[in-house]
From Swiss-Prot:
List of residues that carry N6-(pyridoxal phosphate)lysine: K243
Cofactor(s), names only, from the UniProt record: pyridoxal 5'-phosphate
Provenance organism: Mycolicibacterium smegmatis (strain ATCC 700084 / mc(2)155)
Protein name: Acetylornithine aminotransferase
Cross-link (Isoglutamyl lysine isopeptide (Lys-Gln) (interchain with Q-Cter in protein Pup)): K304
Location (main, coarse): cytoplasm
Amino acid sequence: MTLQSRWEAVMMNNYGTPPLSLVSGEGAVVTDADGREYLDLLGGIAVNLLGHRHPAVIEAVTTQLDTLGHTSNLYATEPGIALAEALVGQLGTQARVFFCNSGTEANEVAFKITRLTGKTKIVAAEGAFHGRTMGSLALTGQPSKQAPFEPLPGNVMHVPYGDVAALEAAVDDQTAAVFLEPIMGEGGVVVPPAGYLVAAREITSKHGALLVLDEVQTGVGRTGAFFAHQHDGIVPDVVTMAKGLGGGLPIGACLAVGATGDLLTPGLHGSTFGGNPVCTAAGLAVLKTLAAEDLVARAGVLGKTLSHGIEELGHPLVDKVRGKGLLQGIVLTVPSAKAVETAARDAGFLVNAAAPEVVRLAPPLIITEGQIEAFITALPAVLDTAAEDS
C-alpha cells in the first residue's frame, strides 16, 4: 500500500488526499517515496526557515531532549526563559511572552487579552486569515471558512484590508482591538499600501484600542526584518507568531507590550505543551543561526532576486509579483494557480495556490541563489503547461 492509500484509510478527510508522500529532506530539497527530489519553495508553509535537517536545530533538539524533555507550565526552564528574552530583545521594547504550540493558539490568547481591556468590539480585515480555532476563525475575514461553524464569538467586524478610511470609520472608543496581518499570507500575499500600518497605529492609539499584529507568517525574518511591522517603524501592543519560530517544531508565541503584558494573571490562560524546553531550544537555535549567518538581511536581498527574476520573464500568465523578502506571491492574469501548483510539482518544484489567482512562495531562508535561478529558469515551461491545462 502507498502512503496515500494508507492516509485515506485512517486520516480525516479535511485535507483531502495529499498528492505527494515525502520521506526525507536536506536543506531546501525534499525527496518523495519514489526517490524523486523537489525544490521546496513552500517550506512547510513558511515554517522551515532553516530548511530540512539543519545541524543547529538537530543539535539543539537532541541535546535538550537528552537533558530535559517536558516539564509542563508548572516549572521554569532555561530554554523557555532564554527564548522569551531573545524575542523581547528583537521586539525592541518591554514586553511579556506567552508560549503555545501554533499560530491559531497565539491568536486565541491575543483575543483573550483584548477582552481583559473591558471592551469587546474588534475590527479585523476582510480576506484575513488568523487560524481555524473558534476565536481565530471569528477574526478570519473569509465567510466560506466561517459559515459551517457559526455562531462564532461575536462583536467582530471586518473592513477592507489596506483601506485607511474604512479602518478609521470602524474604530471608536468602544473598540478593544484591531487585528491585522502586516502582509496577508493565506489571503493571497497581499501587501497593504505604504503607510497603512502607521495609520492603524495612530487610529488605535487615538481611541485607546490595542493594535494586534498577526506575524505568524511574516515574523522571524521572512520579510527581511525580524518582524514585518519593523519595516514601518511602529510598535504594536500585541504580536503573535509561530511557523518559522521553531525551525519545524511546533511552537507559537504571543508578545504583549508594556501594561498590556500584565493583563493575563494566574488562571486566565494556559498551555500544557507551551514553552516546552525542546521546542524553545529549537527556537533559540533558529534565532542564533539567523544572526550568525545574517539570514534576515539575506532574505530581503533574495526576495528581490526572486520577484524581479519572475517579472522580467514577461510571461503572459504573470500579472505581477508582490510580497516582501522570501514571502512572495505570483499574481496571475487568470485564476489558474492550482494548475500552476500542479505543473510546478510535476517539474520538481513545490509551491502553493494561496488564492485562485495567486501562487505563494515561502522558501527556506537558506535557499541558494542557484536554486532560485533554477526555479526562474524552469518557470516559463511550468506556466505554459498550466495555461494548457486550465
